[in-house]
């Protein structure tokens, strides 16, 4: 049974040919059984999470909170960035409809692997996004606040 062709598209997706082509390409890249059904493997679930246009780049591990976050806007109602059971159930539903992947244990493991490979730290990202204004401040920090003499040794 070809899950993509029979179950894979909602009406909105059918109107979007490019999205359908991307989903079809992901479906065709999955490992199949002799009867044409999708194999229920962790590696297939990882392929979907890393390549499906909806999931690609969405699942990341937050190194500050040590939790999995969804950092993209998704098609279902969400209350926070933190990964919830509702998020998992929606991902599983889409994997089942589009790709025939139904084994929730393997999808859970794939989410963990993908989020670990795509980690981020929100504070570091914020700091790396800032530009220095060119004003030297550190050189005068110790003399100003600790009363040390200004010299090249404490710069």
Language-model-detected regions and their locations in the chain:
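Conserved NTP-binding/hydrolysis core of motor NTPases
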Residues: 143-155
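N-terminal nucleic-acid engagement/recognition segments and initiation subdomains in replication
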Residues: 1-136, 150-153
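Long, mid-chain structured domain cores
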Residues: 134-145
């Amino acid at each position: 049974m070809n899950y993509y062709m029979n179950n894979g598209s909602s009406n909105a997706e059918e109107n979007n040919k490019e999205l359908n082509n991307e989903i079809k390409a992901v479906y065709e890249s999955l490992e199949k059984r002799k009867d044409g059904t999708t194999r229920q493997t962790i590696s297939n679930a990882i392929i979907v999470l890393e390549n499906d246009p909806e999931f690609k780049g969405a699942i990341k591990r937050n190194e500050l909170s040590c939790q999995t976050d969804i950092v993209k806007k998704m098609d279902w109602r969400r209350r926070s960035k933190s990964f919830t059971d509702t998020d998992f159930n929606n991902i599983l539903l889409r994997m089942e409809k589009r790709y025939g992947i139904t084994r929730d244990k393997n999808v859970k493991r794939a989410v963990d692997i993908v989020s670990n490979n795509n980690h981020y730290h929100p504070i570091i990202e914020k700091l790396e996004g800032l530009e220095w204004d060119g004003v030297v401040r550190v050189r005068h920090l110790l003399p100003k606040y600790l009363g040390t003499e200004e010299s090249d040794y404490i710069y």
